[in-house]
Curated annotation (Swiss-Prot):
Location of this chain's protein in the cell: Mitochondrion; Membrane
Entry superkingdom: Eukaryota
Organism: Schizosaccharomyces japonicus (strain yFS275 / FY16936)
Gene that produces this protein: lcl3
The protein's name in its UniProt record: Probable endonuclease lcl3
PROSITE patterns, alphabetized: TNASE_3
Length: 233
């Protein structure tokens, strides 16, 4: 009888270990699964499915390229250097290897001058905005906070970057563009603001306008990016 009890206890213990191992594996897989594209982002990641902006889900990763003054391509590196990224595991550097492996990120809360496409001239300061964003983010690690998905299948995100590489101090990139007159506060449909609130961004924009920085130096000739897009549809 005693032997049967011992065998039963061992079986229960082994079963508990198996359940714990499987549960841990599932949690680790969900926590550190690499998000390859917008289709991999489940609805729980986005702001609309979350109760508090103070507890937004976020992704840590690497900016592979900057496309415009307010968007870039993002390669998710879950766990960062702690899980070997950039020293044991490398982020691909050529276009073919990156195909279908990155998310298109649109900065939330701001609107940068439109670059020229398909033979159309870009807006004034579009090149400066793109160059500034590239200087701050390109080939560097950032943290993105998905807010919603736009009509172009981009993840609209709050984005923080690390002014000093590998340190924990972070800054919101949006206000950096607005303060230099390289972007304006976005007030279109589905506008979202994070981590800097709209009221703060508006104050920063007003200061840039008074100082006639960047786009604001154009005075009455300033055409907002949203108006430029409507005119060139």
């Amino acid at each position: 009888m005693q032997n049967q009890r011992n065998e039963y206890s061992i079986s229960l213990r082994n079963l508990s270990y198996i359940i714990l191992t499987i549960s841990t594996g599932i949690v680790i897989h969900r926590k550190f699964r690499r998000i390859k594209d917008i289709e991999d982002l489940s609805s729980r990641f986005f702001r609309g499915q979350q109760k508090s902006l103070t507890k937004l889900n976020s992704l840590y990763g690497y900016v592979t390229s900057v496309g415009d003054g307010d968007n870039f391509r993002f390669y998710h590196t879950p766990g960062g250097r702690l899980l070997g990224w950039h020293w044991l595991r490398k982020v691909p550097s050529n276009r073919n290897a990156l195909k279908n492996e990155t998310l298109s990120i649109r900065l939330s809360g701001i609107d940068a001058p439109e670059s020229g496409y398909f033979g159309k001239l870009g807006q004034p300061f579009s090149l400066e905005a793109k160059q500034f964003l590239a200087r701050k983010l390109e080939h560097r690690s950032v943290r993105v906070y998905p807010l919603h998905r736009d009509q172009y299948n981009r993840a609209v995100c709050g984005v923080t970057y690390y002014p000093i590489r590998w340190l924990f101090f972070k800054r919101d990139i949006g206000p950096q563009l607005v303060s230099r007159g390289l972007a304006v506060v976005y007030e279109g449909a589905n506008s979202s603001y994070y981590p800097t609130e709209k009221s703060v961004l508006m104050k920063i924009q007003e200061t840039a306008r008074k100082r006639k920085l960047g786009m604001h130096s154009l005075g009455n000739k300033l055409e907002l990016p949203k108006d430029y897009k409507k005119r060139n549809k």
